Regions:
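Short, well-ordered junction/capping motifs at the entry into regular secondary structure
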Residues: 1-2
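Outer-membrane beta-barrel proteins and related beta-barrel translocases across Gram-negative bacteria
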Residues: 5-191
């Protein structure tokens, strides 16, 4: 589907191309032209197997003249978003959510239309590995948030968070121990 729109002084053209690479593996490439901002491309790559699945979305804008003129900064702009889930066995799992952008104005300027992510105040950067059974739960999480709102403050990292739980059930009552240990660091995203 070819899309073309025009505001009072801006022309926006895009043409998506869908590629079915093989069973459970596909990609969409979408070259774009925005008259005030230049040429760019967005893509989405999706994969699915019996033990893992995910999607990678990315966008680049090679020479954003409007951004360069307004902020006197590098005009190469980009975004990246990875979501991955994996099952190692019936009790062990991995989840990765990683998003990043070239600058705090990227989502404000392009929103979710440019790379498949919705407008948000932060880009999540999470790594979670977990193991469960009838008697325990163990979760290791590394967590950070990159603030992508120009007015955003209070970025932090959780390096790491470890949750351990043990529980026992019998006829008359249930009991257990829940614990977690977490270290916080003020700062932004993982670079």
């Amino acid at each position: 589907t070819h899309t073309q729109s025009s505001a009072a002084s801006d022309v926006y053209k895009r043409q998506p191309y869908y590629l079915n690479l093989k069973k459970n593996l596909d990609a969409t490439l979408e070259p774009r032209y925005i008259s005030k901002r230049g040429f760019g491309i967005s893509n989405e790559f999706r994969y699915l197997t019996n033990t893992f699945n995910g999607a990678i979305n990315s966008s680049i804008l090679t020479n954003d003249e409007e951004y360069k003129d307004n902020y006197n900064k590098n005009s190469f702009r980009w975004s990246f978003n990875l979501i991955h889930s994996q099952t190692f066995n019936k009790n062990s799992f991995l989840e990765i959510k990683y998003a990043n952008v070239s600058d705090t104005f990227f989502l404000n300027d392009f929103g979710g239309d440019f790379n498949g992510t919705s407008k948000t105040l932060y880009a999540p950067q999470q790594f979670i590995i977990s193991n469960f059974s009838d008697k325990h739960k163990a979760v290791l999480k590394v967590n950070a948030f990159k603030i992508v709102n120009p007015l955003g403050v209070n970025q932090f990292q959780e390096l790491p968070k470890l949750e351990l739980s043990w529980f026992e059930k019998n006829k008359f009552f249930n009991y257990g121990i829940n614990s977690f240990l977490s270290f916080y660091r003020k700062g932004g995203a993982f670079n």
